[in-house]
Amino acid sequence: MIQIVKKNDEIVKYLQKDRRINLNALSYLAYNGDADVHIYDGNIENGVIVGSLRKNFFYLATHNRDFLDEFWESLPVGHKVFSGVPKSIADIMTADREPVWYSPCKVFVHNGVHIAEPNQDFAIERLTAADADEVNEFYTYKSDGSINRIRESIEKMDSACIRIDGRLATWCLVHMEDGSLGPLYTKAEFRGKGLAEAVAVNLMKQLAAKNMPIHVQIADDNAASLSLIKKLGGMDFSHDCAWFGLDKL
């Protein structure tokens, strides 16, 4: 039987046993204190599932197939998004369920030792609410609801951008769902100047100053970002994960 509880010390302690693997779930709980936490048969050692039906994001931290199956059956009809799921768990969840979409990613976590020095050639500032529409227009995963998430991220989370001749040239945000870095984008006409590296390093330093974890999930086919991550300093590969969507009929 599944019980739904709220964040507590026992849940955080369990997730911290494998902090890197569970960092997105830990960060989600840090940024969303009212999130639902699902436990199975009253035993935290069966793992946990963290998420929100309202936001339609779920983080799976269990290999227990019975738990995963019962959780799936408990969900209402509709499209469900699973975020940053470790590959071994994603394989279980999708074994008998065909994803509508599936994006394999690599997770990088900062080792706390070193961040590259920021490029001083550019004036870096925060994004404003007025930038939301433009950021959304260039968002790789643009959807009907993405503008609302981007606007909320800009308003509530840290960000960094560079403007050239008054035009937005490059930007990087922090995801409001789990505190991970992204989206990061540089317009085509401004590429090759080191702008993306400059805003990413600036944003990492903002997070470090607040003692917030620095982590990012990069799609396997995003060669540019996989190359950039090596230049930022201290970003170590952690594990393979996946974002995917399932339709509950």
Enumerate the predicted regions with their spans.
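Short amphipathic alpha-helix that is part of the acyltransferase structural core
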Residues: 1-23, 112-145
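Conserved donor-binding loop and adjoining core beta-sheet/short helix segment
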Residues: 12-75, 164, 169-183, 187-188
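Acyl-donor-binding surface of acyltransferase catalytic domains
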Residues: 46-120, 243-245
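Conserved acetyl-CoA-binding loop-helix of GNAT-fold acetyltransferases
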Residues: 66-74, 192-208, 226-227, 231
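Conserved GNAT acetyl-CoA-binding A-motif
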Residues: 76-86, 207-219
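Conserved active-site alpha-helix within GNAT-family acetyltransferase domains
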Residues: 87-99, 220-238
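A mid-sequence, solvent-exposed acidic-amphipathic segment
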Residues: 132-186
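Residue-level recognition of the GNAT/N-acetyltransferase active site
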Residues: 187, 191, 219
